[in-house]
Regions:
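N-terminal secretory signal peptides that target proteins for export/translocation
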Residues: 1-18
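Sec-dependent N-terminal signal peptides
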Residues: 13-29
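C-terminal segment of classical bacterial N-terminal signal peptides
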Residues: 29-38
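C-terminal His-loop and adjacent cap/lid subdomain of alpha/beta-hydrolase
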Residues: 41-739
Length: 739
């Protein structure tokens, strides 16, 4: 039986469809009748699989069913085109018979079965380490069908050339060339590889061990298997600022480029593995620096993304006559990226890849989400899949949208929009991020520069929204009074969600792109409001809570590396010659202030943050292993409030208990309704999501339905405030005024 996923009015395909449809035919007619064909482009698409309908036949509101196309895009780029010249080692990439540099990118396209019922908008979701995601749906893909109900066409494609394609097209990748010297000899350079917490008894480790994100990367192989030409050492201790202790060199005769899992040391030679004669010690971190060969020209992935998106947006067919399945039906493209893939969106815009080879804009709208840095992909021997660990580039380039000087690092004044301004191809940008981006992903310089002395102004085409008290990507939501600690971390898991606010802001971005309707004002912590401070207990005003560890300067710092004279810092391009790099200085970073509960102030608080059940943290503490006591990677913590005043006093907790805050369950329900109504009025929450959250809170059993006389009075006061807000309309709509 056909499943129907009902539309709740969260996105309206119809209200944008007529306007977009009127533009679609005109755009295609003008382009294909009058434009000169691009020299560099997608030349062929191959559809390997078509599933029609997809999603098990589910229908989505007025849009109906969807279908899916899985395939490959064959493309070529002109290495001499100014738009491609910035790609590192493009001149060392092999050429095809046309003198171009070729690539093959996988893609997945999902579209309404009847495109006339869609909204004519392509939502391009940048894959994260090759993995497809569904950013705005609750419950996966299709989950609650949020974007499908809106009529969006969805596209994912490969951009990261060191990701292996998994069976059954489980992910996306791109085949890019290997750089070679003009005489055919291998291009070489230094590479660093670091690993820790290897189980006792381990003798062999693979350099293709899945990095964060769970993908299998391509290994940069050593030029020589002679271990005297590499340096392996182990560290007994290491700080986040690269201060090491107990550094012990591993003799060259005590390890091998080999696999010892079957044959004992020195094992079977293998350039992708390291064998240690006496085995790895889990109490040490190991670091190897070696001369590698055959770097991938990973910057080609930027051009491939640009070209694939442009093909589906503009082309009617490929050079072989294969039809574009969405030809003449798309008028707008919005790009979204989460974390690493959001960083890639920033890199694309910064390096000029939001202009295609015909001078057209690629993304009219962009939502870099929880993306504090840029993606390290356009330099020799880059490793794009890293995760802001020590010695990994990512915060070296321009991190701010507006032109701004970087006096601390001695860099030229620049901004991420410089190139797109020159070509009139800047998108409308809604940047969204949460607390962990400050604490663990080095967000601060993007707001206040490297000297941390001034708020950097935002350009007119950029809005910025901060989600206080959230973990990386947001928590599971709901209204829990206790959670389970994440793996490897000390504190309970932070449930504070981001998805509800993200959905509302995605609608605002869509309206901005399609209708020109201004989004709400930017909302994020600023210096001039006193909401950004040094990460110390005193500066933040952080309370003393029993069982809650807090150390001053606990954040993952921004380090100023000396990567060598051939590295182009502002563009994070070029060649690294120093591995490991010298740390020249530690950049001042700031974090948000907190209130007496330890909850962050400013930004766009979720409903849960406005009706808190505890302290929601953007950081957590590593529970064990080599990094015990340091920040637990990309993970926020949660410290619940005591349920009653008696419990609070017994535990010496200075934070008011749930009963003291809300009185009864009715009081809590009123607090949630008050927060939800205000967020809807401010366009920070969709009515459909408010209608979901309010009964969810009512069913949460946070408190008893009745209490003491004092509890009942507290609840009655909260409910009277809610009624008062309804009568007086205290929550004004925020239409923004930054244009």
């Amino acid at each position: 039986m056909k499943q129907n996923v009902a539309s709740k009015g969260t996105l309206s395909a119809g209200r944008m469809r007529l306007r977009a449809a009127a533009c679609a035919g005109l755009t295609a007619a003008v382009c294909f009748a009058g434009c000169v064909p691009a020299e560099a482009k997608v030349t062929q698409i191959v559809i390997d699989q078509r599933e029609s309908p997809t999603y098990a036949g589910a229908a989505f509101g007025t849009v109906g069913q969807y279908e899916k196309f899985i395939g490959r895009a064959f493309g070529e780029i002109d290495p001499n085109d100014r738009r491609n010249a910035i790609i590192q080692d493009i001149q060392l990439a092999p050429r095809n018979a046309n003198g171009k540099v070729a690539y093959v990118a996988t893609f997945t396209l999902v579209k309404p079965l009847d495109m006339t019922k869609g909204n004519n908008i392509l939502l391009y979701q940048v894959v994260n380490r090759g993995n497809r995601g569904q950013a705005f749906n609750i419950g996966g893909d299709p989950g609650d069908g949020f974007v499908q109900n809106g009529g969006y066409t969805l596209l994912w494609s490969g951009w990261q050339g060191d990701v292996a394609l998994r069976p059954n097209h489980a992910n996306e990748t791109v085949q890019v060339p290997v750089a070679k010297n003009p005489d055919g000899s291998p291009v070489t350079g230094p590479v660093i590889f670091r690993f820790a917490n290897e189980p006792a008894g381990t003798h062999t480790i693979s350099l293709a061990v899945p990095p964060p994100g769970g993908f299998t990367g391509v290994v940069y192989q050593p030029l020589s298997l002679d271990t005297t030409k590499a340096t392996l050492e182990k560290h007994a201790a290491e700080s986040t600022t690269a201060v090491t202790g107990g550094v012990v060199p591993v003799p060259s005769n005590a390890w091998a480029w080999a696999d010892c899992s079957v044959v004992p040391f020195p094992g079977t030679p293998d350039p992708t593995k390291i064998c240690l004669k006496d085995g790895f010690d889990p109490s040490f971190l190991y670091q190897i620096v070696y001369t590698a060969k055959d770097p991938l020209v990973l910057g080609v992935g930027l051009a491939a993304t640009r070209d694939v998106v442009s093909f589906f947006r503009h082309a009617t067919q490929d050079d072989a006559g294969t039809a574009n399945p969405v030809a003449n039906h798309l008028s707008y493209v919005i790009g979204h990226g989460t974390s690493q893939s959001g960083n890639l969106l920033k890199t694309m815009i910064h390096l000029g890849f939001n202009e295609d080879e015909q001078g057209r804009i690629v993304f009219q709208g962009a939502n870099p989400y929880i993306a504090a840095r840029q993606t390290p992909t356009n330099f020799r021997f880059a490793l794009p899949g890293g995760a802001a660990t020590l010695f990994e580039p990512g915060s070296e380039p321009v991190l701010w949208w507006q032109d701004w000087p970087d006096k601390v690092r001695g860099r030229a004044r620049a901004g991420m929009l410089d190139r797109c301004r020159d070509t009139d191809t800047c998108p409308k940008i809604v940047e969204t991020f949460g607390a962990t981006e400050f604490w663990d992903l080095r967000m601060s310089p993007g707001l206040v520069g490297t000297d941390a002395k001034h708020d950097i102004p935002l350009p007119h085409n950029v809005r910025r929204f901060y989600f206080p008290g959230t973990t990386h990507g947001g928590g599971a939501g709901g209204f829990p009074t206790a959670t389970t600690p994440p793996s490897a971390c000390t504190l309970q898991s932070n449930p504070n969600p981001e998805i509800d606010t993200q959905r509302a802001l995605f609608v605002a971005l869509t309206d901005w792109v399609v209708e020109g309707k201004r989004p709400p004002h930017s909302r994020y912590p600023r210096l001039d409001e006193g909401l950004l401070v040094r990460p110390t207990k005193a500066a933040m005003g952080f309370p003393t809570v029993p069982g809650l560890p807090f150390s001053d300067n606990f954040e993952n710092p921004v380090l100023d590396y000396d990567l060598g004279p051939k590295f182009i810092y502002n563009d994070m391009s070029g060649i690294i010659s120093n591995e490991p790099p010298t740390v020249q200085q530690v950049i001042t970073t700031l974090v948000p202030r907190v209130n007496a509960d330890g909850n962050e102030i400013g930004g766009v608080p979720s409903v849960q943050h406005q009706a808190p059940l505890g302290t929601y943290l953007g950081w957590n503490v590593m529970a064990a292993g080599f990094f015990k006591g340091q920040i637990c990677a990309f993970t926020g913590g949660f410290v619940p409030f005591a349920k009653s005043a008696v419990d609070r006093v017994a535990s010496h907790d200075p934070r008011p208990s749930l009963e003291e805050r809300y009185g009864t369950q009715d009081g809590y329900n009123c607090a949630v309704r008050l927060a939800a109504k205000g967020a809807v009025a401010q366009r920070m929450l969709l009515q459909a999501d408010a209608d979901r959250l309010i009964p969810q809170a009512a069913a949460s059993n946070v408190l008893p339905t009745t209490g003491s006389a004092s509890d009942n009075r507290t609840a009655a006061l909260l409910c009277s405030l809610e009624r008062l807000s309804d009568q007086h309309g205290d929550h004004d709509s925020d239409d923004g005024d930054e244009d």
